[in-house]
Amino acid sequence: MKSILSQLKTAVSEALIKAFGEDLKDTDPLVVPASNPKFGDYQSNVALSLTKILKKNPREIAQSIIEALDIADTCENPTIAGPGFINFSLKPSYLATLLKEVQQSDRLAIEPAENPQKVIVDFSSPNIAKEMHVGHLRSTIIGDSIARILEFRGQDVLRLNHVGDWGTQFGMLITYLKEVYPDALTKADALDIGDLVAFYKKAKVRFDEDEAFKEASRNQVVKLQSGDEESQKAWQLLCEQSRREFQKIYDILDIKLTERGESFYNPYLADVLTALDEVGLLEEDAGAQCVFLEGFKNKDGDRLPLIVQKSDGGFNYATTDLAAIRYRIKEDQAKRIIYVTDSGQAGHFAQVFQVAERAGFLPDDVEVVHVPFGLVQGEDGKKLKTRAGDTIKLKDLLDEAVNRSRADLEKRLAEDERQETADFIEKVSQVVGIGAVKYADLSQNRTSNYIFSFDKMLALQGNTAPYMLYAYVRVQGVSRQGGIDLSTLPTDTPIILEEAAELTLAKHLLQLSEVLMSVEQDLMPNRLCEYLYDLSRKFNQFYEACPILKAEGDRRISRLILADTTARTLKLGLSLLGIEVLDRM
């Protein structure tokens, strides 16, 4: 079914044409959820926007719209407030009818997108020979959630992992390993990621201090780039070692990705320069090939160049990103390309997108968008680090979340004198620990920095994953207590919405599709988190105010349907955030 918001927008659009003629057929009906319940459920200020066009008083325009509206089955009589706002209050009978559709649908009656597109979500993107750190957490979690929501909406999503698998660091690392540990370049599993990172750090020190080593490293890069068999094999072994470590993290987080690293685009880099030259954008500056940017200037007021080929003939990130855009549009046929990286790269992407547009790489029907996110901070408000001042490894952070979740659970079990199996304790600890980390990140406006606090994210109260999971568990508890299989509730029993808490919950349950459409457009997963938090609160209020199992007849079944629909909505919503649910905690 179409969302309530979509239905009301259509109704207001039709009323505008009926009242004022075809000239207004493309007018935005400006229907939004009401800012305050005292104004009803939805509002439109379209009458105010038409005063100049129609040369009429906005209240008079609003009255004409109301008289032309055909929503008697949907809403109570609309009212006019203030200078000309139209307020809509939904009828309980209409809500009950929609909830019956939701009850009988695997998708909660949420329609997929009318015109699905090929969408690429580029996220996570760690570097080979380096461990994933807390900065990769945000890209991985936010990108995964965006991909899940787009997939649920019916878009054809390609999830790409643009790993850093190319560049001078490999010449440096291979040269160093040849000296100190040649087995690592010929034997799989000769070293683990921790060793690889340590070797990388030592190689970097040598590179910075030893000119002969620096020269040997650069020669090694040339050999690698020219396809030298021994160098290629060594490079592939190093990549494979890192890949296995990345996969361990992705398995813990339940992340699905297609790897397509920087090296994939190597054959297409020269073509980028040719294409830029053909449209007259390529210029030489201090021996480098570049494109001078519009709107980007240095401190002297001169236009900034985007370098696409260095003076030594090497290519860089900008060249690779331009090649990737061309490939993704021409070969993958993408209509929307989403890049999920930290906000520090906003300038880079703005420059790359500008050059791609000016060069004609971007057709009018293709959207490229950077989805930036802020820093993860410690409780001191500074960038999250270990006590020794090092970057926190992602694996260590996730292990800590699960361990703390386990400790909280074991403490509760002891206080309640509850006995549970080791398997139960392990499962709950994993789901709550990992879910808490994901939700704490996703519930923030992604553009903001956020304070990482295990105590806050694992709390059973407040806007946390455990609070949401507990609301779901509560419904399953009703099922167990009443000996009721919620999946077999009758579909012909009317839904009764007489109590205020029933009505409030029903309205909220029917807003999920509006929220998902909003996230699909604006790529802000925190809106889904806010919706789920409000849903959990409204359900808990309903649970306290409206006894479920003590009710009788149709009222009992109606409340069971409301509870089950809440649980199904929580399960779907949390799954779109990459979070599992539990029947018991």
Curated annotation (Swiss-Prot):
SUPFAM superfamilies cross-referenced by the UniProt entry: Anticodon-binding domain of a subclass of class I aminoacyl-tRNA synthetases, Arginyl-tRNA synthetase (ArgRS), N-terminal 'additional' domain, Nucleotidylyl transferase
Name used for this protein in its record: Arginine--tRNA ligase
Subunit note: Monomer.
UniProt similarity note: Belongs to the class-I aminoacyl-tRNA synthetase family.
Stretches that traverse the bilayer: none
Localization of this protein: Cytoplasm
GO MF, any single term: ATP binding
Pfam families named in the record: Arg_tRNA_synt_N (PF03485), DALR_1 (PF05746), tRNA-synt_1d (PF00750)
Swiss-Prot/TrEMBL catalytic activity: tRNA(Arg) + L-arginine + ATP = L-arginyl-tRNA(Arg) + AMP + diphosphate
Organism, scientific name: Picosynechococcus sp. (strain ATCC 27264 / PCC 7002 / PR-6)
InterPro entries: aa-tRNA-synth_I_CS, Arg-tRNA-ligase, Arg-tRNA-synth_N, Arg-tRNA-synth_N_sf, ArgRS_core, DALR_anticod-bd, Rossmann-like_a/b/a_fold, tRNAsynth_Ia_anticodon-bd
Known EC number: 6.1.1.19
Entry keyword set: Aminoacyl-tRNA synthetase, ATP-binding, Cytoplasm, Ligase, Nucleotide-binding, Protein biosynthesis
Motif ('HIGH' region): 126-136
GO cellular component labels: cytoplasm
The keyword Cytoplasm appears for this protein: yes
GO BP: any one term: arginyl-tRNA aminoacylation
Top-rank taxon: Bacteria
